[in-house]
Amino acid sequence: MDLSVKSEENVEYMVEAIKEKLRMVNAGAMRAASFNEEMYEDLRDIYDHVMKRETFSISEMQAITEELGTLIKK
């Protein structure tokens, strides 16, 4: 998958991968359709960060979740 291309499919792929990697408890609240496509690069940065790490502390997971929240359409 070429994540350098801004598309709905790529947004969905990254959101699902982040949810799976972080084993998010409230994953249902984070839907790919809720994300603002204008923030694609920010989502990609978060995705890259999450994918290169093996484990996360609780505070890191909270910070990532909060950052994802800023990318959701208002």
Curated annotation (Swiss-Prot):
Q: Which Pfam families match?
A: DUF1128
Q: Which HAMAP family match?
A: UPF0435
Q: Which family does it belong to?
A: Belongs to the UPF0435 family.
Q: What is this protein called?
A: UPF0435 protein BC_0449
**Natural source organism:** Bacillus cereus (strain ATCC 14579 / DSM 31 / CCUG 7414 / JCM 2152 / NBRC 15305 / NCIMB 9373 / NCTC 2599 / NRRL B-3711)
List the lineage, top down. Answer: Bacteria, Bacillati, Bacillota, Bacilli, Bacillales
